């Protein structure tokens, strides 16, 4: 535990185009080397592609995709008497959001489409439909937690 006070959470400003705080946070996750304007171009480009393909509000598709990626439980390593157990723990809401954004960006980067905007749009559309690599990651995490349910009494 830190000896000092915990740093206060900074208020994040909503993004200029859609007025969404979640989207502003996501733009920050996409950003590399402090290049925010490039990240904004990528995310807004992806949302344009999503609106053309899905014929729905892009922000709704984005939020549905994040919701489908959010993990409810995860495993944490805990040492007990020389043995390390994978203990399932519930994921707090702020971490759920952070993990879902991180996984969406991570698996978008691994895709084969030409531009990052196209990759992000494709992964977002798949996640909104409940498939895709990011959703598979969540299912794998849930499966790990289910397999190690026997160790859930080793709470943190």
Curated annotation (Swiss-Prot):
Q: Hey, which family's this protein in?
A: Belongs to the universal ribosomal protein uS7 family.
One BP term from GO: translation
HAMAP family per record:
Ribosomal_uS7_B (MF_00480_B)
Record flagged with keyword RNA-binding: yes
Sum up the protein's function in the record's words: One of the primary rRNA binding proteins, it binds directly to 16S rRNA where it nucleates assembly of the head domain of the 30S subunit. Is located at the subunit interface close to the decoding center, probably blocks exit of the E-site tRNA.
Q: Which gene encodes it?
A: rpsG
This protein's name: Small ribosomal subunit protein uS7
Q: Which UniProt keywords apply?
A: Ribonucleoprotein, Ribosomal protein, RNA-binding, rRNA-binding, tRNA-binding
Q: Which cysteines are joined by disulfide bonds?
A: none
Give the source's domain of life in one word: Bacteria
GO MF terms listed in the record are: rRNA binding; structural constituent of ribosome; tRNA binding
- Subunit text: Part of the 30S ribosomal subunit. Contacts proteins S9 and S11.
Q: Which InterPro entries match?
A: Ribosomal_uS7, Ribosomal_uS7_bac/org-type, Ribosomal_uS7_dom, Ribosomal_uS7_dom_sf
A Gene Ontology cellular-component term: small ribosomal subunit
Q: Matching Gene3D superfamilies, A to Z?
A: Ribosomal protein S7 domain (1.10.455.10)
